[in-house]
Amino acid sequence: MSTIKIEKKSQLVKEVFDSVASRYDTMNDIMSLGMHRLWKDRMVNSVHFTKNSKVLDVAGGTGDIAIRIVRKEPSAKVTVCDINQNMLSRGRDKAINSNQINFDWVCANAESLPFEDSEFDYCTIAFGIRNVSDRKKALNEAHRVLKPHGKFICLEFAPMHYQNEIFTKLYDLYSFKVIPKIGSIVAKDKSSYEYLVKSIREFPTQADFKMEIEEVGFKNVEFHNMSYGIVALHIGTK
């Protein structure tokens, strides 16, 4: 299996999400059997958002996390940031349909955020960190824009490592054969979903990603597995 070259990743990611934006939520439901909704609920419910807090949701184009945050804490001021304008447009439409009209929507790269130092109380990112070209830059930027004692909350798929050979083969079959086939049928785009599966396989283990978060300066970093380690929630404090 070939790896994704860093120098080509930004353009590839843009093309992938340009292609799947209109059917992104539908595909998430189909591929995860609806579980992505529960994972996102747990992510938001794991954090106590203080009143009038400023939250930056990175790679948050679909608005899923932002909408959940303001439902939990209506006074929160949420900025949704995504590198892909098509995803932001879809998220803005979804937010309006959910009667959430007070978000700020910013098209920007997670590796070069257009915000001041120490501007936000919380920085969230769900299923986005594996798509950045340079994780260290993105993590450094998250650390920079957070206030002292601010929280970094990251939800991401994890590479699966099972001792059970049969389960491993079934998981690989579903990931590399079934998911791209579903993408071909539902989203008319097989190659984009081949990329998404490959990006999960190339992501570091939960323990290794924890170390990456710590290396940029976050303290008290911990992670919690969900659904037997299919996804993991990492939380750190500036």
UniProtKB/Swiss-Prot annotation:
GO molecular function list: 2-methoxy-6-polyprenyl-1,4-benzoquinol methyltransferase activity; demethylmenaquinone methyltransferase activity
Protein's pathway: Quinol/quinone metabolism; menaquinone biosynthesis; menaquinol from 1,4-dihydroxy-2-naphthoate: step 2/2; Cofactor biosynthesis; ubiquinone biosynthesis
Catalytic activity of the protein: a 2-demethylmenaquinol + S-adenosyl-L-methionine = a menaquinol + S-adenosyl-L-homocysteine + H(+); a 2-methoxy-6-(all-trans-polyprenyl)benzene-1,4-diol + S-adenosyl-L-methionine = a 5-methoxy-2-methyl-3-(all-trans-polyprenyl)benzene-1,4-diol + S-adenosyl-L-homocysteine + H(+)
Gene3D superfamilies cross-referenced by the UniProt entry: Vaccinia Virus protein VP39 (3.40.50.150)
Cysteine-cysteine disulfides: none
PROSITE patterns: SAM_MT_UBIE (PS51608), UBIE_1 (PS01183)
GO biological process: aerobic respiration; menaquinone biosynthetic process; methylation
One Pfam family of this chain: Ubie_methyltran
Keyword S-adenosyl-L-methionine carried by entry: yes
InterPro entries in UniProt: SAM-dependent_MTases_sf, UbiE/COQ5_MeTrFase, UbiE/COQ5_MeTrFase_CS
Keywords carried by this UniProt record: Menaquinone biosynthesis, Methyltransferase, S-adenosyl-L-methionine, Transferase, Ubiquinone biosynthesis
Top-level taxon of the source organism: Bacteria
Enzyme Commission (EC) number: 2.1.1.163, 2.1.1.201
Uppermost EC category: transferase
Binding site for S-adenosyl-L-methionine: T62, D82, N109, A110
Stated family: Belongs to the class I-like SAM-binding methyltransferase superfamily. MenG/UbiE family.
Stated role: Methyltransferase required for the conversion of demethylmenaquinol (DMKH2) to menaquinol (MKH2) and the conversion of 2-polyprenyl-6-methoxy-1,4-benzoquinol (DDMQH2) to 2-polyprenyl-3-methyl-6-methoxy-1,4-benzoquinol (DMQH2).
Name recorded for this polypeptide: Ubiquinone/menaquinone biosynthesis C-methyltransferase UbiE
Gene coding for it: ubiE
